[in-house]
């Protein structure tokens, strides 16, 4: 699936991934390919994007996560590596 992670000042990730684990406002949410359409507000915490055997970990604070088709968009109020 295609994943993008952006913050107001930069793009942090844009590529293919096998899974995403993100801090929703009410707990962690896991996204795999072919996930149902989904929209949630983000809380504060680690966001992990897995590509095959490697993972990219970011810290996000606020924003939203959207799943449409095979695309996951993460728009964070604040994000860092």
Stretches with model-predicted labels:
Residues 2-81:
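Compact, glycine-rich, soluble single-domain proteins
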């Amino acid at each position: 699936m295609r994943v993008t992670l952006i913050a107001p000042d930069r793009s942090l990730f844009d590529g293919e991934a096998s899974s995403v684990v993100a801090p929703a406002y009410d707990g962690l949410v896991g996204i795999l390919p072919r996930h149902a359409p989904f929209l949630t507000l983000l809380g504060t915490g680690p966001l992990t994007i897995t590509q095959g055997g490697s993972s990219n970990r970011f810290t996000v604070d606020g924003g939203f996560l959207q799943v449409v088709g095979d695309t996951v968009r993460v728009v964070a109020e604040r994000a860092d590596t």
